[in-house]
């Protein structure tokens, strides 16, 4: 790509005319802002070097963790005999932070940054959990199951703090979702400690609470989305990861609490699954996020499979299910923008103003791919 100064020098040297230079500038500016429907772009890989660095970082972190575990075993710092050592995860977390200082802060590499963030927060979580478990003792854990919930909550709280520190230093979009997941784990851990692990209704209570947390995460994601309705900044990437977290937290409890996840779906239950999936599809179109559809895909595949089986297509039920769902999703993908316009435009203006803009412009840099 030629710079502005090089174009001016070419005009001064008589290589091209001033009119041609102006036309070239206008053409490039036009290419940088082409009106296309958003395709939920997010930056993950800019080249094979991202994959190369990610593989190398994973190998290094595995080695560091293995060495930490070996040192812990030699020093007798393990949970039970040959159990996990609290020396391994802090070594992984510290190494992840050190690597992020270069590959995230300086090189701005997307995929390695995501991996290093997850290993850092995971390392802090494991360090706190293993340390508290060792301090309490395995006997106390075995005789008082509520302590386990408290340890989970405390560990997740420290992990949430670590995610906040990482966000303050590196601003990796997925960090906010990692922090939200940690806060959710704190809430669930405290719930288990209060209700008691031996309660017969604990599973349903957790599922209901998880649904509430999922809705809260979804609303948090919508707040980030609402602050960047044109999806031009990092805030949109933050919202993407939050939606990816919220989707299974919403979908799994709904289908499980309705009894649609027990392997014995009836015809009516299968129809309920399909209707719920359609409702999720309308919501996904309205907010312009595909995560809800992906999270519920396994449930609707199972439901359609059961419907085809009950209608007598036993041998072809799997193939017919894949054919119907695959065709429907491809059709939706091809006409996503048109379908979204049909759903969003009739909405009240107050609600429409909170959703991503329908006809927005996605900027495309002239020298590199968008994302």
Task: Please report, for each region that a protein language model flagged, where it lies by residue.
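Alpha-helical multi-pass membrane segments and their bilayer interfacial helix-loop junctions
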Residues: 1-371
């Amino acid at each position: 790509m030629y710079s502005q100064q090089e174009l001016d020098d070419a005009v001064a040297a008589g290589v091209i005319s001033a009119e041609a230079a102006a036309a070239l500038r206008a053409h490039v500016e036009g290419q940088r802002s082409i009106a296309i429907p958003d395709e939920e772009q997010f930056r993950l890989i800019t080249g094979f070097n991202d994959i190369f660095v990610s593989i190398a970082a994973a190998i290094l972190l595995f080695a560091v963790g293995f060495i930490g575990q070996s040192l812990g075993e030699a020093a007798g710092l393990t949970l039970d005999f040959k159990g996990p050592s609290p020396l391994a995860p802090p070594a992984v977390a510290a190494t992840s932070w050190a690597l992020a200082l270069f590959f995230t802060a300086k090189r701005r590499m997307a995929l390695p940054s995501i991996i290093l963030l997850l290993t850092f927060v995971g390392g802090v979580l494991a360090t706190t959990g293993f340390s508290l478990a060792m301090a309490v003792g395995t006997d106390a854990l075995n005789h008082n199951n509520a302590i386990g919930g408290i340890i989970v909550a405390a560990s997740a709280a420290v992990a949430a703090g670590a995610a906040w520190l990482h966000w303050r230093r590196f601003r990796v979009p997925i960090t906010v979702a990692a922090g939200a997941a940690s806060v959710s784990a704190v809430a669930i851990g405290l719930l288990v400690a209060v209700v008691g692990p031996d309660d017969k209704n604990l599973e349903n209570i957790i599922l209901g609470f998880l649904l509430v947390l999922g809705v809260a995460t979804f609303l948090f994601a919508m707040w980030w989305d609402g602050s960047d309705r044109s999806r031009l900044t990092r805030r949109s990437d933050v919202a993407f990861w939050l939606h990816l977290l919220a989707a299974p937290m919403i979908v799994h409890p709904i289908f499980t609490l309705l009894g649609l996840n027990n392997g014995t779906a009836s015809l009516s239950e299968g129809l309920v699954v399909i209707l719920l999936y359609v409702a999720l599809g309308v919501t996904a179109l309205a907010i312009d996020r595909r995560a809800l559809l992906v999270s519920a895909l396994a449930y609707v595949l199972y439901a359609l499979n059961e419907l085809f089986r009950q209608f007598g297509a036993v041998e072809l039920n799997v193939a017919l299910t894949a054919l119907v769902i695959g065709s429907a999703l491809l059709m939706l993908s091809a006409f996503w923008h048109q379908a979204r316009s049909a759903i969003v435009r009739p909405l009240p203006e107050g609600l429409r103003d909170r959703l991503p803009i329908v006809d927005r412009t996605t900027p495309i840099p002239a020298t590199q791919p968008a994302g």
